[in-house]
Amino acid sequence: MLILTWNCQGAFRRKAQQIAQFMPDIAVIQECESPAKLRWAKGVTPPSDFVWFGENSSKGVGIFSWTKWTFTIDPSHDPSIHHCIPVIATSGADEGAGDKVNLLAIWASGHKQKELSYVGQVYRAVEQYHDFVRQRPTFVLGDWNSNAIWDRERKVNNH
């Protein structure tokens, strides 16, 4: 199984072929444009399934598969926790068939509520999705944008 995560820093439409060549089972792409902006070059296999979340079409989190994996957003999803998305990944073509794993796809970024910026989002997501991550095997992956050297204020949801 090939799982990868990458902060593409925008303009995924110009970089997507770099990921497609590996045909990953699961790819979590941060700062990813809306898939509606993607155009696949001749000879490049497009993803077989994807979900995408973002506040605008320029940057969000994209979760893609180039194999048999399909994605469903878990009902516990809380849109107020920006860019921390609980996803059920299922292998196999039939709904409900095959193996399942959970993904918590993360792109920690700025937020208008200071306490929810960067690591604050991740902290809140871990609390909110506690039951989700314990349901079945789970991958928590993405860009945490987290480093203690950036902490200027000590707060509960910090390093």
Predicted regions and their residues:
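Surface-exposed cleft-lining segments at the edges of enzyme active sites
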Residues: 73-74, 104-123, 148-154
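N-terminal, active-site-proximal structural segment of metallo-dependent hydrolase catalytic domains
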Residues: 1-44, 53-55
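Glycine-rich phosphate-binding loop signature in dinucleotide/nucleotide-binding domains
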Residues: 22, 95-98, 131-136
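Soluble or luminal CAZymes and related metallo-dependent hydrolases
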Residues: 7-11, 79, 114-128
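Metal-dependent phosphoesterases centered on the DNase I-like endonuclease/exonuclease/phosphatase
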Residues: 120-159
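Structured beta-strand-rich core segments of catalytic domains in phosphoester-bond hydrolases
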Residues: 32-110
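Short catalytic/ligand-binding loop motif for oxyanion handling, primarily in non-cytosolic enzymes
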Residues: 12-14, 35-38, 111-113, 147-151
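Active-site-proximal beta-strand elements of phosphoester/diester hydrolases
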Residues: 1-9, 98-112, 141
